[in-house]
From Swiss-Prot:
This is Autophagy protein 5. Keywords: Autophagy, Isopeptide bond, Membrane, Protein transport, Transport, Ubl conjugation. It holds the Pfam family ATG5_UblB. It is found in: Preautophagosomal structure membrane. Involved in cytoplasm to vacuole transport (Cvt) and autophagic vesicle formation. Autophagy is essential for maintenance of amino acid levels and protein synthesis under nitrogen starvation. Required for selective autophagic degradation of the nucleus (nucleophagy). Also required for mitophagy, which eliminates defective or superfluous mitochondria in order to fulfill cellular energy requirements and prevent excess ROS production. The gene is atg5. The lineage of its organism: Eukaryota, Fungi, Dikarya, Ascomycota, Pezizomycotina. One of its GO terms (biological process) is autophagy of mitochondrion.
Amino acid sequence: MENQASLNSIQKTVWDGKLPLQITLASSESRTFDQTDPYLISCPRISYLPSLLPRLRSFFASSLIEPKSQPHEGWFSFEGVPLKWHLPIGLLYDLYAGADPASKGSRPDESEQIISSVGDTLPWRLTLHFSDWPDEELVRLDADGMVMHDAFINSVKEADFLRNGTAKGIMSLSKEDSSGLWEAVQDVDLPSFQRISNILLPAPNQPFRNVPIRFFLPLPPDSGSPSLKVVQSPLPPSIPASTANATQSTVLRGKPASQLQTIGSALHSLLPNLFPSRRTPVLAKPVLHGAAVPMSAPVEEVARSAAYGDGWVYIVVRMMG
């Protein structure tokens, strides 16, 4: 496993990541004839859209047809698609608008195309609504923020159970630490987050039971299925060794040889048609925090350094070509 300093450096880079947003009030809810001025903000990738609602409600207050609307009644859409408020902003962008991520192997002409494509999608243009809540697609929020808080903590519990085989860690947290974990994500306070999350993580010399990873596969609008398909399965950090990858193999006393589970081996196991090779992206590539993930990256190292605030690694599978 990489040394802890390297993993901490990656985690800091992830938490420093931001995304420019341009948020416009839905024209059907604006009292002005022309479109209202948009709200521009650089938002942390690990944060959640509902955290913006109080300031957006104040910003658009003079333009609202319904002046009694409350911040928690707000919801967001992108190109007519309601956005899941329980997913981090960075993940939502990677799912719906992210351009093809640059990689070290890109040729100069390819890099220019990538930069041009990114420029077309940034700032990310979202529409804000305060009426006609899409009940079939989104759970309603509440004025006290408890719906959002509970959704986050439940996700933390799921990740904790997969890592340790039990959720005793999160269940035994004090009320102060439980609330503090969510507040640290909202405030993008990495030191406070690390202090609490380190209570939940197995020690560096203790492997995870399973690694909490979800793979998202965007589907075409005319597929007749939901717009997103999520693939998830228990992924242990090590797997039986193959003769083709003996360099990563370790032989434990009285146990069969094993090797590190990588992003490539996990994708090949779960999605063999899209990832026929464990080592090289052929038809699709894994994207995390807007960047292509090396197929050789061990899944546990990815989880320790680049998970979102709820402990989950959310990887978007993007088709190539």
